[in-house]
Regions:
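Predominantly flavin-linked oxidoreductase catalytic cores and closely associated redox partners
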Residues: 94-239
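Long, charge-rich, low-complexity alpha-helical segments
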Residues: 123, 455-523
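Long, low-complexity, charged/polar intrinsically disordered regions in eukaryotic proteins
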Residues: 383-457
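C-terminal helical "tail/cap" subdomain of flavin- and related membrane-associated enzymes
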Residues: 302-405
Length: 523
């Protein structure tokens, strides 16, 4: 993305591709990103298996159950199960095709600084060559190595997800029954959970996620293969699928993998992907977060290079947007862990969300998001298949009930006459901390100044049109709906006044149902 914007980009890659990497299961949210990168046609032609959803043994029912992307994502109803050596090679070649100077086998050993600003890097190649490169921005995409996070002491380990994974690749695994044969399969068992991901190579990626502290001794005193086999045998469905399978590659181990950096952008540098944060892999979020942060960090650097006046604000916008996405996946994973009450083992007991106020808060933004999901959305599946903490489930249902009450009230107020006279006399009042702010928003490959609507549940702000900005700015707790419509209707072309009023009234209804407009006085 940076190269497309005209920047000269040097990519120093430690490995030589293709190389092994875990994280094969993509999400539909990554499809538009791959399209924007220009690599989607190559991904579609690579032969990867189409992933329609997930099948799980989790929660109160020992029978496998499935959810499907099409239930919540009509535009992109599927993703892919990718073989990472091939998939990552496609991404690397796509970078080369767009003008990036890619140097494989080059490891960055040090970031260079001058007066607190990152000014370049020192590297060493696998042939022993060393060198330095001066640059205007350093993008740290070093993954869990976390070069800048280590240098600046930015990484904060997540106390909730203290897990590790042992995984390998099996041939001749039995697939799930149709129509779920290409789904990722996740099975909880007393000491953790297992993933099984079918691949177009004929292999299946299988991994066990276990508690780091309690598993270290067993792993260190035995073989990884015996450890993985001992976990698989505890999961009846997975062990049945692998009954005639053979381990072809691995096992491998990934340790200490849940963390977030307190700062992801600064003077002359930005962190992207796993270098910035990583969350438990339950919802296959790793590749999506990496791709998303690649787009956002490139936009930040482009903006900072074009206009230094926006650099600091764009850095804050990048951090808000990226960490909001990270936070959503984190809270969703925490909710799923806490909902699995089928076992009293240490693994699951240690990952329960307690009801007391000191250890469990409603996390209003996440509750709002979950409450807005269709009944079969995968965020909602935990409420049906597991046993979510009572306070959380109660909060979600309370939000849903309040939204429905508001919708009915709004429709009733509009149905009095054809002109909607009952609603015209109402006096709207904004919820506390609702504001229109000028902030950087994501444009075409860069951050640009724009207008956002900020609320308690969306403090980072939602980009809004001039009409919404004008409407919300006029809501003062004294003007009626009719007066507000007259004012915004007068701001545009007089011939469009009627259409503007109708659009503004519809927008006001959405704001009321959502709670941004807290009250409608006089109704």
């Amino acid at each position: 993305m940076l190269a497309r914007q005209g920047a000269s980009v040097l990519l120093l890659e430690r490995e030589r591709f293709p190389r092994e990497h875990v994280g094969e299961s993509l999400l539909p949210a990554s499809i538009p990103v791959l399209e924007e990168l220009g690599v989607l046609p190559a991904v579609q032609e690579a032969g990867f298996l189409t992933k329609w959803g997930a099948t799980m043994v989790w929660g109160s029912d020992p029978t496998p159950w499935s959810w499907y992307f099409r239930e919540t994502n009509q535009r992109n109803p599927h993703a892919y199960q990718v073989w990472r050596p091939q998939f990552d090679q496609l991404l690397l070649e796509n970078s080369r095709a767009h003008g990036v100077d890619v140097r494989e086998g080059h490891r960055v050993v040090e970031v260079l600084w001058e007066d607190g600003k990152a000014t370049g890097v020192r590297y060493q190649s696998d042939s022993g060559e060393t060198g330095t490169v001066q640059c205007r921005y350093v993008v740290d995409a070093s993954g869990q190595t976390g070069l800048l996070a280590r240098d600046l002491n930015l990484r904060q380990w997540d106390p909730f997800f203290q897990n590790l994974a042992v995984y390998g690749y099996f041939s001749s695994a039995q697939p799930l029954p149709e129509p779920d044969e290409t789904n990722i399969f996740i099975e909880a068992y007393p000491h953790g959970w297992l993933w099984s991901i079918p691949l177009h190579t004929g292999w299946t990626s299988v991994g066990a996620v276990v508690d780091s502290a309690t598993s270290q001794n067993e792993i260190s005193t035995g073989s990884l293969q015996r450890f993985l086999e001992s976990q698989i045998i505890q999961a009846p469905h997975t062990s049945r699928m692998l009954r005639n399978a053979h381990l072809e590659s691995g096992p491998f181990i990934v340790k200490d993998w849940s963390y977030v950096c307190e700062r992801v952008a600064g003077d002359g540098y930005v962190l992207a992907g796993d270098a910035a944060c990583f969350v438990d892999p339950l919802f296959s979020s790793g590749v999506h977060l990496a791709l998303m942060s690649g787009i956002l960090s490139a936009a930040y650097v482009t903006s900072a290079l074009k206009g230094p006046g926006i650099a600091e604000a764009a850095a804050a916008a990048y951090q808000e947007l990226y960490l909001k996405e990270y936070g959503h996946f984190r809270e969703m994973a925490r909710l799923f862990y806490s909902s699995n009450l089928t076992s009293g083992s240490y693994f699951w007991e240690a990952r329960r969300l307690l009801e007391d106020a000191g250890n469990f808060t409603p996390r209003q933004a996440f509750i709002q998001a979950v409450a807005g999901q269709p009944p079969r959305g995968y965020e909602r599946a935990v409420l049906e298949q597991g046993q979510a903490p009572l306070e959380f489930a109660s909060s979600v249902r309370q939000v849903e009930s309040e939204r429905e009450r508001r919708r009915v009230r709004w429709e009733a107020a509009r149905s009095g006459t054809d002109t909607g006279e009952p609603i015209l006399a109402a006096v709207p009042k904004l919820a506390p901390e609702t504001q229109i702010q000028r902030k950087p928003i994501l444009g075409a490959g860069e951050f640009v100044w724009g207008t956002v609507l900020t609320t308690i549940s969306q403090p980072e702000g939602t980009p809004c049109s001039g009409l919404i900005s004008a409407l919300v700015s006029q809501i003062d707790g004294a003007r009626t709906v009719g007066q507000l419509l007259d004012e915004v209707g007068s701001l545009g072309d007089p011939s469009q006044a009627s259409q503007i009023r109708q659009t503004a009234l519809a927008a006001l209804g959405i704001l009321y149902v959502d709670g941004t407009v807290e009250e409608l006085g006089g109704l």
